[in-house]
UniProtKB/Swiss-Prot annotation:
Catalytic activity: RNA(n+1) + phosphate = RNA(n) + a ribonucleoside 5'-diphosphate
Gene name as annotated: pnp
Record note on quaternary structure: Component of the RNA degradosome, which is a multiprotein complex involved in RNA processing and mRNA degradation.
Predominant place of localization: cytoplasm
Residues annotated as binding Mg(2+): D488, D494
Keyword Cytoplasm on entry: yes
GO MF: 3'-5'-RNA exonuclease activity; magnesium ion binding; polyribonucleotide nucleotidyltransferase activity; RNA binding
Protein name: Polyribonucleotide nucleotidyltransferase
Biological process terms in GO annotation: mRNA catabolic process; RNA processing
GO CC terms of this entry: cytosol
Superkingdom as given in the UniProt entry: Bacteria
Length: 694
C-alpha cells in the first residue's frame, strides 16, 4: 500500500491531495485537505453502458458527517438521515462544472461521492469538494476532459478576496463560487450586495486566474499516479440515417419553429417525429429499418441545427423576437384575499403565483449543520408542479432542481431584506410555478419582490431577474435576452442575473462549451442589465414600493420592557404563567434575558389583554394601595393571601378585624376573596397586609 501526496499553496491555505491508501477499490479516490477541512472524494464508473441507455447517468452525492465537527447527530436514530439543503446545493455545485466535460455519447454510469470527514468552521467545504472531485476523476481513467479548478471570491473595500474565511464572508459584499478549466469558465454561483456588472465580471476573472495553480497541481497528480485511460470511443455518426431524417422532415421542423405558441409548436414537432418514425423505424414488417432511439437523436440534432442557425443568421427567434426583446409582461398584486401578501407574475408563457406569509420568531426555521444550530428567519420555497409544462408527473417533496432554484431566488432578494430590528417578522415566501417556458427561477425573483412589497416588508429596493442565453458558432455568436425553454436546451450558456436598478444581487452561470470569452460575458451582463431595468419598470406598474402596513391578518408586534429579574415571574414555574397568558389572550410571547417582551397578536384587543397581564405580574407592590386578594392558607397567627399574580403576603391576626381575633377560621376561609391594603414593606422585601385598614 503506497500513499502519494501532492501539496500546493492556494492563497492563504495549503491544499493537500492524498491517494493510494484509502478507498482503493474505487476507480479514483482522493483525500483532499484544505487546512483542517478534509474530504474523501471517490469516483466509480461502470465499464459498460446499459443497453438502450440514451442519457448520461452521472450522480454526485456530497455528504457531511457529524463526526467531522465532533458532534453526534440529533433525532431518535442519532445518525445522518436524508440530505440537508446544504448537501443538496453542494452536490449541484459539484455536478454543474464537471457534467459538460464528459465526452458526447458517453452513457456509462458515473458516481461521485464527496464525504466531509473533518471540518474547520472557518474553511468552507465547497472548494475542496470540487478540487477533490476534479482530482479523483482525473486519475480514474474515466473519459473526462478536465481537470477543473474552483475558487470562492469575496469583495471588501474594493479588493477581491480568494477563498475567504467564514468570518470574512460575513463582512464581504460578495460570495461568488467559480469553477472552470485552464482556459474556460464553466460555472458561477454568487450572492452580492448590489454590485456593478464590472465588479461581478472582475470577480469571475479573478477567481479563474487564481484557480490555475490548482489545475496545474491536478495535472501533475494525474501525470504521476493517473490510471490508464479507458479504451472508449464515441460511436461514429450514421451519416446515411442523418441524411434521410434531415431530408424527410427538415421543412416540417422549420415550419414548427415558426409557431410561437409552445404547446402548438410541440404538437407540430411530435407530428414530424411520428412521420419520420413511420418511414424509417424498424418494425416487424420492416426489420431492416433504423433503431427508434437513433432516429430520435437525429431529430434532436436537426432541431438544434435549425434553431441555432436561424439565430446566428440574425433571423427572428422561435417566438418571433429579436435577441434583446423581453417577452410581454403582466404583473398583479393582491390576488389572494386572506394571505399576507401575494403577486402574480407572467412573462410570456412563464408564470408564478408568489405568496408571502409573516410569522413570529418562533416560526423561524431551525438549521442544524456541522457548524452548529441557528434560526433562519427568511425562507423561500419554489414549487414546480408537472402541470406547469402540460405533463403528468410526481408530486411530493421538492427535488434537487426545486431546492436549487429556490436558493437562487433567495440569493437574489436576501441582500434587500430589512434586519430583524427593522422588521421583527419571520418571512416565508412560496413560489408556485403555474406555467413554464424558460426562466421560472427569475420569474420567482420578480414575483417575490412584488409579493414582499405587497405584504408590507420594507425592501430596500425592488428586485427583478432575467435569464440570458448564448449561441456560439465559428461564424459568430449571439447573446439572447429572456430565453425560452428550448433556447436554454439548445444553447451554449444559461446565464441568470437578479438585481435592482443599482446593481447585481445574484448571478448564476452554466456554460456548456469552451471559448466563452470575457468579451462575451461582458456583453451578456450589459444586455442583462438593460432587460432587468425594463422588467423593473413593468413591475412598478403593479407596485412600486412596499405597503406602509402589514395585512390585517398578519401578526402585529408590541414590545414591553420589564426588569430582567421579572422575567422568571412572567415565565412562571415550568412555563405555567406565560402559557396561561398565551392561551387566554391568543397571543404569542417571546422574551429574552434582558427583559424584552415581544408580543405578537392579530388585533389590539388581544395585545392589550396580554400587556395588562404582564403589567400585573411585574408590578411592584405599592404602600397604601388596596388589592383584591384570595386567602391561600390559614395559620394560627393569621392568613397568607395572594394579592398580586405570583405574590403572597401575610395578614397578621391583629390586622383581620378591629376586635381581638381568637380563631382566624371564624373570620376567613381558604379560597375566600377579600380586599387588603398594603401598609408597609420591610428591608427584606416582606409586605404587611391589613384587612381592617381597608
Amino acid at each position: 500500500m503506497s500513499k502519494f501526496i501532492k501539496s500546493f499553496q492556494y492563497g492563504k491555505h495549503e491544499v493537500r491531495f492524498e491517494t493510494g491508501e484509502i478507498a482503493r477499490q474505487a476507480d479514483g479516490a482522493v483525500m483532499v485537505a484544505m487546512g483542517d477541512t478534509q474530504l474523501l472524494v471517490t469516483v466509480v464508473g461502470a465499464k459498460n453502458a446499459k443497453a438502450g441507455q440514451d442519457f448520461f447517468p452521472l450522480t454526485v452525492q456530497y455528504q457531511e458527517k457529524a463526526y467531522a465537527a465532533g458532534r453526534i447527530p440529533g433525532g431518535f436514530l442519532k445518525r445522518e438521515g436524508r440530505p440537508s439543503e446544504k448537501e443538496t446545493l453542494t452536490s449541484r455545485l459539484i455536478d454543474r462544472p464537471i457534467r459538460p466535460l464528459f465526452p458526447k455519447g458517453f452513457m456509462n454510469e458515473v458516481q461521485v461521492i464527496a464525504t466531509v470527514v473533518s471540518l474547520d468552521p472557518e474553511i468552507g467545504t465547497e472548494v475542496p469538494a470540487m478540487l477533490g472531485t476534479s482530482a479523483a476523476l482525473s486519475i480514474s481513467g474515466i473519459p473526462f476532459d478536465g481537470p477543473i479548478g474552483a475558487a470562492v471570491v469575496g469583495y471588501k473595500d474594493n479588493d477581491y478576496i480568494l477563498n475567504p474565511s467564514s468570518q470574512e464572508l460575513q463582512e464581504s459584499d460578495l460570495e461568488l463560487s467559480v469553477a472552470g478549466t485552464s482556459d474556460a469558465v464553466l460555472m458561477v454561483e454568487s450572492e452580492a450586495s448590489e454590485l456593478s456588472e464590472e465588479i461581478m465580471l472582475g470577480a469571475v476573472m479573478f477567481g479563474h486566474e487564481q484557480m490555475q495553480v490548482a489545475i496545474d497541481a491536478i495535472k501533475e497528480l494525474k501525470a504521476e499516479v493517473g490510471k490508464p485511460a479507458w479504451n472508449w470511443e464515441a460511436a461514429e455518426e450514421d451519416i446515411d440515417l442523418k441524411t434521410k431524417v434531415f431530408d424527410a422532415i427538415r421543412s416540417d421542423i422549420e415550419a414548427a419553429y415558426d409557431i410561437a405558441d409552445k404547446m402548438d409548436r410541440y404538437a407540430a414537432i411530435d407530428a414530424a417525429k411520428t412521420k419520420v418514425m413511420e418511414a424509417l423505424a424498424a418494425t416487424e414488417e420492416n426489420p431492416e429499418g433504423y433503431d427508434a432511439g437513433d432516429i430520435e437523436k437525429m431529430v434532436g440534432k436537426l432541431q438544434k441545427e435549425i434553431v441555432r442557425g436561424r439565430i446566428i443568421a440574425g433571423e427572428p427567434r422561435i417566438d418571433g423576437r429579436d435577441t434583446q426583446t423581453i417577452r410581454s409582461i403582466d404583473c398583479q398584486v393582491g390576488i389572494l384575499p386572506k394571505v399576507h401578501g401575494s403577486a402574480l407574475f407572467t412573462r410570456g408563457e412563464t408564470q408564478a403565483i408568489v405568496v408571502t406569509t409573516l410569522g413570529t420568531e418562533k416560526d423561524a426555521k431551525m438549521v442544524d449543520d456541522l457548524t452548529g444550530s441557528y434560526n433562519d428567519r427568511f425562507m423561500l420555497h419554489y414549487n414546480f408542479p408537472p402541470y406547469s409544462v402540460g405533463e403528468c408527473g410526481r408530486v411530493g417533496s421538492p427535488g434537487r432542481r426545486e431546492i436549487g432554484h429556490g436558493m437562487l431566488a433567495r440569493r437574489g432578494v436576501a441582500a434587500l431584506l430589512p434586519t430583524a430590528d427593522e422588521f421583527p417578522y419571520t418571512i416565508r415566501v412560496v413560489s408556485e410555478i403555474t406555467e413554464s417556458n424558460g426562466s421560472s427561477s427569475m420569474a420567482t425573483v420578480c414575483g417575490t419582490s412584488m409579493s414582499l412589497m405587497h405584504a408590507g416588508v420594507p425592501l430596500a429596493a425592488p428586485i427583478a431577474g432575467i435569464a440570458m442565453g448564448l449561441v456560439k458558432e465559428e461564424s459568430g455568436f449571439a447573446v439572447l435576452s429572456d430565453i425560452l425553454g428550448d433556447e436554454d436546451h439548445l444553447g451554449d450558456m444559461d446565464f441568470k442575473v437578479a438585481g435592482t436598478e443599482q446593481g447585481v444581487t445574484a448571478l448564476q452561470m452554466d456554460i456548456k462549451i469552451t471559448g466563452i470569452t470575457q468579451e462575451i460575458m461582458h456583453i451578456a451582463l450589459k444586455q442583462a442589465k438593460e432587460g432587468r431595468l425594463h422588467i423593473l419598470k413593468e413591475m412598478e406598474k403593479a407596485i412600486g414600493s412596499s405597503n406602509q402596513d402589514v395585512a390585517t391578518t398578519a401578526p402585529r408586534f408590541f414590545t414591553v420592557k420589564v426588569k430582567p429579574e421579572k422575567v422568571r415571574e412572567i415565565i412562571g414555574k415550568g412555563g405555567a404563567t406565560i402559557r396561561s397568558i398565551t392561551e387566554e389572550t391568543g397571543v404569542t410571547i417571546e422574551i429574552d434575558d434582558d427583559g424584552n417582551v415581544k408580543i405578537a397578536a392579530v388585533d389590539d384587543e388581544s395585545a392589550n389583554a396580554a400587556k395588562a397581564r404582564i403589567a400585573e405580574i411585574t408590578a411592584e407592590p405599592e404602600i397604601g394601595k388596596v388589592y383584591d386578594a384570595k386567602v391561600v392558607k390559614i395559620v394560627d397567627f393569621g392568613a397568607f393571601v395572594s394579592y398580586m399574580p405570583g405574590r403572597e403576603g401575610l395578614v397578621h391576626v391583629s390586622q383581620i378585624a378591629d376586635e381581638r381575633v381568637e380563631d382566624v377560621n371564624e373570620y376567613l376561609k381558604e379560597g375566600q376573596e377579600i380586599k387588603v391594603r398594603l401598609t408597609d414593606v420591610d428591608k427584606q422585601g416582606r409586605v404587611k397586609l391589613s384587612i381592617k385598614a381597608v
